[in-house]
Amino acid sequence: MTLKGNGAPEGISYGRGSSMTQTRLRFYIGELDWQGQPVPAICFDEVERYLGTHYPGFTLYHTEGFWQGSRESSRVYEVLTLGGPDPAIVSEYFAQVCGQRAGLVTIETVEVITCTT
């Protein structure tokens, strides 16, 4: 990402009277596939590479939850966007990379932040 003199990424203006919107998204990706088998680590490596390429950075953490009556571990990727690709593309990419081994992907918009100068 290239920053201009005012600290704004290229293509984004922070001039007087302008506004910028950031969205905090969470991608919950199940660690088990549809048959209850562990999703191969290479699938997560590819998703992390994709996120690192298309978003400014991400936070990764793990969570345990219940889905349809059974306990399931998920990897949670949280990103703060300044645009970037449509979030649904991440789940499409995950399904493309992992095929039938892909786990459930849930996308949640956590927060929308608008700054006006």
Label every model-predicted segment.
Residues L3, G7-T117:
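Positively charged, small/polar-rich N-terminal and surface patches that mediate targeting and assembly
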